[in-house]
């Protein structure tokens, strides 16, 4: 075994320690966690090459104590891509993406019934320990081919997604129905930005995506395009995200729950 997902979706009711006097019964929960740490300590020492993943739902322990033994945790059993944007955005305030268990799940989502594209689901899950949470035997040939491409893409950029410098660029507090994330390599050679449009609207304003963390003196391409931009331009003037006004101009009007991805590469 190389990997163990440690889950425990079970309540502890009528908590009581037979070895504790009445005035120490409130210590039960604390002592229980010390026992979990002790078990983790013995297991990780006996099997140092096994990756343990803990769970936020199973025991509600997404904290630094558990991360010492299990450096990866399942953020939530809510796997809807749109819900997960909010969950992972909040998680990012305390933990790096390499710690987030983030999977593409089936649709309609089993908790909220929402339909989202497999493209958007993957673009949310890329920021984290990427995987799939679905029955592969029910996938269409097209979906199977898409998943192969997604896995290959993630393997190519896994270190950047998990260990790059992570930036929160936009939230619905600052932008209408939008979240924006970015990860930048330590050498500022490569960056990947993501813009999540939750609900679409008619006649959108011109959209510019403002990067962070690039080298202002270097020059970059976006999505292997022919145009070259300085890092200063991408961070201060932003990158123009084309949008159409209606289906008379293009049949590809983005729908609700759309995600744009920007792969930025230095050319000097």
What are these regions (language model features)?
Residues 212-227:
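Solvent-exposed beta-hairpin/edge-strand motifs
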Residues 172-216, 261:
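Carbohydrate-binding surface patches
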Residues 1-119, 129-138:
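Active-site neighborhood of glycoside hydrolase catalytic domains
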Residues 7, 52, 125, 193, ...:
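Conserved, mostly hydrophobic/aromatic
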Residues 231-268:
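C-terminal beta-strand-rich structural cap/linker in extracellular carbohydrate-active enzymes
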Residues 119-170:
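Catalytic cores of secreted or luminal carbohydrate-active enzymes
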Residues 20-28, 171-180:
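Carbohydrate-binding/catalytic loop surfaces
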């Amino acid at each position: 075994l190389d990997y163990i997902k440690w889950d425990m979706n079970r309540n502890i009711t009528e908590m009581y320690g037979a070895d504790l006097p009445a005035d120490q019964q409130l210590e039960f929960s604390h002592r229980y966690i010390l026992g979990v740490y002790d078990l983790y300590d013995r297991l990780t020492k006996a099997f140092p090459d096994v990756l343990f993943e803990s769970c936020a739902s199973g025991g509600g322990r997404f904290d630094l104590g558990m991360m010492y033994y299990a450096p990866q945790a399942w953020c939530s059993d809510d796997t809807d891509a749109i819900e997960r944007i909010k969950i992972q955005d909040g998680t990012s305030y305390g933990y790096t993406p390499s710690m987030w268990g983030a999977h593409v799940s089936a649709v309609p989502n089993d908790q909220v019934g929402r339909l989202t594209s497999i493209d958007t689901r993957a673009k949310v899950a890329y920021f984290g320990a990427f995987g799939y949470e679905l029955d592969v035997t029910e996938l269409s040939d097209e979906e199977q081919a898409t998943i192969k491409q997604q896995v290959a893409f993630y393997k190519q950029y896994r270190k950047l997604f998990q260990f790059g410098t992570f930036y929160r660029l936009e939230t619905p507090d600052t932008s209408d129905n939008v979240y924006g994330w970015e990860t930048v390599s330590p050498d500022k050679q490569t960056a990947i930005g993501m813009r999540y449009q939750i609900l679409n609207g008619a006649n959108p304003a011109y959209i510019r995506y403002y990067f962070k963390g690039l080298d202002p003196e270097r020059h970059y391409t976006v999505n292997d395009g022919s145009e070259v931009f300085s890092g200063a331009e991408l961070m201060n003037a932003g990158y123009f995200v084309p949008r159409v006004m209606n289906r008379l101009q293009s049949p590809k009007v983005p729908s609700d729950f759309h995600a744009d991805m920007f792969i930025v590469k230095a050319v000097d």
